[in-house]
């Protein structure tokens, strides 16, 4: 299969690819999948065909949209899958982690304000505030675990691989253990934000929405979209490749 023209291959073969595989080939597919609420991160292991069937979507219509998006020059497409893992780690921290740290206190303040002012007539805002407070608390701990435990270890095994030095086993045994925990937490965060999207009816504003209300829903939508990209980079690229690197460096010294 030609990686450069993934959306121009036979439709039958294309539909068997998972959502994650498609986005890995060309990250611009993420924007199309977002519009159709196709989860390419936490549940990205579903085939394109199965995902469309589950949601009652017209697969051919989406493929056509993907083909049109691929007509744009590929020159500036970001090839995350080709990056060194330590560089990808820094990218995730500097872009997605920093975005979460900056935006989540602001959104939380708006969530509380909108729930207080509009909760009587729009009780869903009270529930959204409760859910987002859980997201806030969980992600704060999640980012800390990645930045203080998992990511430094990934940088360590990359350094060992490049220097061909003898690796030392981490206290957590295998990288698969913290990765399994991170993936579980990704799923939990994704589920919470999905429930928020349902409660907001896909971020649809009521007629009496004030400026803060409008800003708040835009922030929630942007936050969910960023989380999808963030989780995709980790679950579909960083983690699988890190597992392979760890297996390789220990195998070389055990053989």
Language-model features and meaning:
Residues 1-255:
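Small-residue-biased structural context
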């Amino acid at each position: 299969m030609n990686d450069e023209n993934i959306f121009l291959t036979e439709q039958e073969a294309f539909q068997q690819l998972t959502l994650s595989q498609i986005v890995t080939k060309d990250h611009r597919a993420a924007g199309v999948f977002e519009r159709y609420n196709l989860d390419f991160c936490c549940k990205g292991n579903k085939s394109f065909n199965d995902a469309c069937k589950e949601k009652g979507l017209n697969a051919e219509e989406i493929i056509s949209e993907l083909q049109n998006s691929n007509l744009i020059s590929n020159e500036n497409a970001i090839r995350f899958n080709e990056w060194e893992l330590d560089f990808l780690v820094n990218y995730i921290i500097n872009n997605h982690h920093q975005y979460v740290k900056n935006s989540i206190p602001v959104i939380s303040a708006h969530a509380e304000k909108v729930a207080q002012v509009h909760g009587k007539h729009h009780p869903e805002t009270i529930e959204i505030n409760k859910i987002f407070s859980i997201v806030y608390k969980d992600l704060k701990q999640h980012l800390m675990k990645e930045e203080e435990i998992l990511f430094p270890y990934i940088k360590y095994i990359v350094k060992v691989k490049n220097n061909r030095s003898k690796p030392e086993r981490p206290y957590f045994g295998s990288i698969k253990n913290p990765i399994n925990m991170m993936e579980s937490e990704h799923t939990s965060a994704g589920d919470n934000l999905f429930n928020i999207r349902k409660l907001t009816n896909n971020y649809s504003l009521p007629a009496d929405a004030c400026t803060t209300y409008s800003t708040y829903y835009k922030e929630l939508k942007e936050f969910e979209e960023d989380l999808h990209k963030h989780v995709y980079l980790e679950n579909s690229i960083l983690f699988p490749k890190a597992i392979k690197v760890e297996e390789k460096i220990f195998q070389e010294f055990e053989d």
